[in-house]
């Protein structure tokens, strides 16, 4: 190794071979350090801002006092102790694997205590959502589903898949159902195979919605032909959920406060019009 070699040629072969300095310096012309300009500063600022936005979100840490001292949990692990599972964001294979693992763990602890699943998802991959759905139906625990924010596409299917009577939503959430979408490329035969597969998935999803909403297949097909957005009250009438909650039971209350459907005022009776001759 040649210590002392600098790109700028200020110090070349400074230790053992000083005679090589002029020769090597001729091949490495002096370079000035880049000057800091306004454009460079703005570019650096934009780069740092983009890096910060791509960084993973911070997960809060909960510290609890125990008889053996302090114990720290990340917030999702602490909620898991209370049998709460969060399905947040797009549903893909990684989210499905985490949710399935939590469901199986909670069943191993007790197969009778309910599991609370909070959903705020725009949907995602159909096969990943069906993996969560099948696990929900497989385990023995009753599952309470809660819609916070939105439950769209596969999110609405998971919301409807909760135990009957235990499917909830907060009053300002949005629910959306639609038919599956996808694309295919390649040879004509391959495209035909993909089209046949997505049609099978479409019928499979229709049957699942019909099972949990108690609607006929004709009603489901008509509702899911295009994006169908619903308020919590509309989703309750459709059969996707059972209750729209304002807040949990307070002291002295047996049941949580529900959003009541506003009564429709009857139109005033029209006065009879005298017959004209």
Curated annotation (Swiss-Prot):
Q: Where is this region: Disordered?
A: 246-277
Q: Where is the sequence biased in composition, kind Low complexity?
A: 265-277
Q: Does the keyword Transmembrane apply?
A: no
- CDD domains documented for this protein: S14_ClpP_2
Its Enzyme Commission number? 3.4.21.92
Instruction: Note the effect listed for residue 153 to A/C.
Output: Abolishes protease activity
What keywords were assigned to this record? Answer: Acetylation, Deafness, Disease variant, Hydrolase, Mitochondrion, Protease, Serine protease, Transit peptide
Enzyme class of the recorded protein, top EC level: hydrolase
A GO CC annotation given for this chain: endopeptidase Clp complex
List the active site. 153 (nucleophile), 178
Give the range of the organelle targeting sequence: 1-56
Q: In which tissues is it expressed?
A: Detected in liver (at protein level). Predominantly expressed in skeletal muscle. Intermediate levels in heart, liver and pancreas. Low in brain, placenta, lung and kidney.
What are the BP-aspect GO terms? membrane protein proteolysis; mitochondrial protein catabolic process; protein quality control for misfolded or incompletely synthesized proteins; proteolysis; proteolysis involved in protein catabolic process
Q: What is its main location?
A: mitochondrion
Intracellular or extracellular location(s): Mitochondrion matrix
Q: Name one GO molecular function term.
A: identical protein binding
State the superkingdom: Eukaryota
| Complex formation | Fourteen CLPP subunits assemble into 2 heptameric rings which stack back to back to give a disk-like structure with a central cavity. Component of the ClpXP complex formed by the assembly of two CLPP heptameric rings with two CLPX hexameric rings, giving rise to a symmetrical structure with two central CLPP rings flanked by a CLPX ring at either end of the complex.
What this protein is called in its record is ATP-dependent Clp protease proteolytic subunit, mitochondrial
Task: Give the organism the record lists.
Answer: Homo sapiens (Human)
The gene coding this protein: CLPP
